[in-house]
Each structure stands twice: as C-alpha cells, then as structure tokens.
C-alpha cells in the first residue's frame, strides 16, 4: 500500500498495523482485512525485540572481551557508566541478597531503552523498505508500542515476584501474606484475598500498560505529524518532538527498571 495514494486516515491506520502471522496456517495475514485472534502473532514486534536483545548482548560482550585495566576507550567508558548507574540503583533499592537482580535490572533497562529508541527512526523508513523490497503488507518497528510485548515482559517480572516471594517466605508464608493481611483474622480471609490479589495483579498490569501507553502515544504523535502535515512543514514539529522524546524514551526505560527492582525487593522482604 503506497503511502502517496492514502488519505491521512488510511496512512495513520496503516502505520498502526502490525505484520501478523496466523499460527494455525503459518501464513502472513492482511492486517487491514483480518481481525487479530489468540492465534495471531505480531512477528514484527517479536523480530525487532529479539534483534535488539541480541544487539544488547553483542555490545556488552564486545566490551567485556576488550576491557582493560588501563585507560578505557570512549565506548567502554560509556558502558561502564551505564553499569555503574544500574548497580547503584539496585544497591539503593533492593534489600535482598540475590545476585541476579543487578544483571536483570541492567538487561531490562538497556533492552527497553533500545526498543524505545526505535521510535526515533523516520516513521516511513523501515515500513517503506519492508513494503517495496520484501512485499510486506505492514510493519511496526517499535516493540514497546505493542501491548503484547510490554505485558509479556511484565508477566516475566510477575513470575519472578511469585518466585522470590515463595523462595523467601515459603509457600505457607506466601499464602499467609495473601490471606491474613491487612486484617489479621480468619474471618477476613476472603476480603484479604481480594485486596492482596488485586494489589499483586495490578503490579504487572500497570508495569506493562504504563510503558505501552507512553510509547504508543509517542509513536502516534510522530504518525500524526507525518500523516496530516505537508512534508515541508513536518520538520518544524518533528525535530522538537524527537528531542523531547529522547527524554521520554530514557525515562520510561528507567521507570520500568526501577519498578522491577522495587517489586522484587518487596517480594524478598519478610513482613
């Protein structure tokens, strides 16, 4: 679908569609004429998230192999600054003894940042290549603007919350925490279970939706600027918004990391 033949409404709708695979037939579907189901996979979001994850691993592995005790290079210094920043954040916010939290926090921060950073690419660049070179019906390049990706990451954090809660308190302690707080009486077990259950489930939901909402809104603004304004005036709004969006990209990655650390710290504490 050539963007020059679209109305502004078609242009916006086209850029909000994912490249989808029907898992029942293992064939690409036309997102304009297909309603997503449980068996529909957004393969563009999966592809870019995996590629960016591998990029993160490659960058840090390269620095680790070349690290020296002498004067570090600029890239090594930059990576060391990120590691030091994340390590300091974990040290301040996590009060447990697990050695996994710092590497996890580093992975979360850099991976989410790289996914968010895709939002700064020209809105038509990769979709144009996908359409005209590979014949793809649609392509979205910002994985964190896909609610499936953000909620999947939040689900991973939720599983870790349950794991650390049971590890530190035991199954009995975890169940007691859900049933005997905030009212420490057996008669209030149903009320406690509802209150604590909602509190527990709200953590991954809010974690995933917060990241999705902010990145989706940022992506939508770029699309609106490109779809509704003439090309010669787009730079007037695009450049200031892109500069401001750099702050949003970094802040959202930081918030996701901080909340992950805080939730796991809460799960590791005795009450």
Swiss-Prot record:
**Stored Gene3D superfamilies:** ATP synthase, F0 complex, subunit A
Main subcellular location of this protein, as a coarse class: membrane
Transit peptide recorded as keyword? no
Q: Which GO terms describe its molecular function?
A: proton-transporting ATP synthase activity, rotational mechanism
Query: Localized where?
Result: Cell inner membrane
Against CDD domains, the record matches this protein to: ATP-synt_Fo_a_6
Q: Which GO terms describe its cellular component?
A: plasma membrane; proton-transporting ATP synthase complex
Question: InterPro entries this protein is in?
Answer: ATP_syn_F0_a_bact/chloroplast, ATP_synth_F0_asu, ATP_synth_F0_asu_AS, F0_ATP_A_sf
Pfam families named among the record's database cross-references: ATP-synt_A (PF00119)
Q: Where are the transmembrane segments?
A: 38-58, 100-120, 146-166, 211-231, 242-262
For the biological process aspect of GO, one term held by this record is: proton motive force-driven plasma membrane ATP synthesis
What is the membrane topology here?
Answer: Multi-pass membrane protein
Q: Which UniProt keywords apply?
A: ATP synthesis, Cell inner membrane, Cell membrane, CF(0), Hydrogen ion transport, Ion transport, Membrane, Transmembrane, Transmembrane helix, Transport
Q: How does it assemble?
A: F-type ATPases have 2 components, CF(1) - the catalytic core - and CF(0) - the membrane proton channel. CF(1) has five subunits: alpha(3), beta(3), gamma(1), delta(1), epsilon(1). CF(0) has three main subunits: a(1), b(2) and c(9-12). The alpha and beta chains form an alternating ring which encloses part of the gamma chain. CF(1) is attached to CF(0) by a central stalk formed by the gamma and epsilon chains, while a peripheral stalk is formed by the delta and b chains.
Its function, per the record, reads: Key component of the proton channel; it plays a direct role in the translocation of protons across the membrane.
- Family designation: Belongs to the ATPase A chain family.
UniProt-recorded name of the protein: ATP synthase subunit a
Higher taxonomy = Bacteria, Pseudomonadati, Pseudomonadota, Gammaproteobacteria, Enterobacterales
């Amino acid at each position: 679908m050539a963007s020059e033949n679209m109305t502004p409404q078609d242009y916006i709708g086209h850029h909000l569609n994912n490249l989808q695979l029907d898992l029942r037939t293992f064939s690409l579907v036309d997102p304009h004429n297909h309603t997503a189901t449980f068996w529909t996979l957004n393969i563009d979001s999966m592809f870019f998230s995996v590629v960016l994850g591998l990029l993160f691993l490659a960058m840090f592995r390269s620095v680790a192999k070349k690290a020296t005790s002498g004067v570090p290079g600029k890239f090594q210094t930059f990576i060391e600054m990120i590691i030091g920043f994340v390590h300091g954040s974990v040290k301040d916010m996590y009060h447990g003894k697990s050695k996994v939290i710092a590497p996890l926090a580093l992975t979360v921060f850099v991976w989410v940042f790289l996914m968010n950073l895709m939002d700064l690419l020209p809105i038509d660049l990769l979709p144009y290549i996908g359409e005209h070179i590979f014949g793809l019906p649609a392509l979205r390049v910002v994985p964190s603007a896909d609610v499936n990706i953000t909620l999947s990451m939040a689900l991973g954090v939720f599983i870790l919350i349950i794991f650390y809660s049971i590890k530190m308190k035991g199954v009995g302690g975890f169940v007691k925490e859900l049933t005997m707080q905030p009212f420490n009486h057996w008669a209030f077990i149903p009320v406690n279970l509802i209150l604590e259950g909602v509190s527990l489930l709200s953590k991954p939901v809010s974690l995933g939706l917060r990241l999705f909402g902010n990145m989706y809104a940022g992506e939508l603004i770029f699309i609106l600027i490109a779809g509704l304004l003439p090309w010669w005036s787009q730079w007037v709004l695009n450049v200031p918004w892109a500069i401001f969006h750099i702050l949003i990209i970094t802040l959202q990655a930081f918030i996701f990391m901080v909340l992950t650390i805080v939730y796991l710290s809460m799960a590791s504490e005795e009450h």
